[in-house]
């Protein structure tokens, strides 16, 4: 059986004790952790689903990290073992993968905070800090919150190129040494090469710089240079969500600074194109214009700054005349189709312009007592519809341009390609 972990305890236990066998393969989807809503006797310390076989164990991310596969298997972080229900049908254990076993398949319900076994229909539960499965009982021991252990990519991959060129006017950029996927690999400067996957990165919404080599491999601070407290090498490491040493920002001087050491920025030591190895470092720039510490994100995306902003939620209408106004306007605008008009903003099969007219012409019914609340909701929905209409128009215009370009045959396409120097 396996246990949950009190993150205040300490000791070392391997995930690979008392494990069974049989095998095939299943590709992991993403790393995650599961925290129990059960508080325990102290009512303070949170508990996590852990691979440890003892209650007193180290609070390390590796034994709290699991890999969810597309088909519902929950792997250990090493990828060698999966969660299964024991032969007795009660306790949960770690075994090797058997794709034909339904008791190794789980469904994570993030809405209701449940983890259900598909073999017997029972739910992940806690029995004296041991992990088991049991029929649904409504207890906190069956409630789990899950969260990602890996960054969520934004989709915009590119190079971090130095603004300084070598003597032959070649660009150089951040590179994982030998394209290694191993943790604690040095990050160095290499000449930028097309499709060199070890040079391709992206900055995630939480400030990590993610390598294209692996979905869980990020830029991190490496060892100190000669014991210095202001000069460090850079390397790669496993993603840690709240580790400021792994989080970065870009300032107005095109410097990449570290969130833990905000006065230190990424630069390099050596002569580009001359020295056999040019190490990337985290150090103090000599000035705001120190070109060894200035970077170009290539390619750049005009929407990067917009889509990386924290989304501003719509005003929530949950009760009273605000909710009544929202539901009335939704029904009126959609001719009774829905009382939640926001659910249709992304639909391409409805006329948002028609909805806008209906909302604009609506008058406050007698069932709604606050005309002020009604007016506020009405103006808010009109603004939201205006935004949605304009965003859709941008993509419609692009689609129209794209279609007309190809409808003219190859001539326009060839001329355009020549114009932007791709042929």
From Swiss-Prot:
Q: How does it sit in the membrane?
A: Peripheral membrane protein
Annotated Ricin B-type lectin domain ranges read 27-147, 118-251
The record's subcellular location field reads: Cytoplasm; Membrane
Taken from the record, one Pfam family name reads Ricin_B_lectin
The organism's place on the tree of life at top rank: Eukaryota
Tell me, using the record's free text, what induces this protein: Induced by high levels of extracellular Ca(2+).
GO BP annotations listed: response to cation stress
Molecular-function annotations in GO: carbohydrate binding
Q: Where are the compositionally biased (Basic and acidic residues) regions?
A: 1-19
Keywords attached to this Swiss-Prot or TrEMBL record, sorted alphabetically, are: Cytoplasm, Lectin, Membrane, Repeat
- Gene Ontology CC annotations of this record: cytoplasm; membrane; nucleus
List, alphabetically, the InterPro entries matched: Ca_Up-reg_Membrane_Reg, Ricin_B-like_lectins, Ricin_B_lectin
* Disordered, as annotated region: 1-27
- What's this protein's family per the entry? Belongs to the cup family.
Give the function comment from the record: May play an important role in stabilizing and/or regulating the cell membrane during Ca(2+) stress or certain stages of development.
Name of this chain's protein: Calcium up-regulated protein A
Which organism is the protein's source? Dictyostelium discoideum
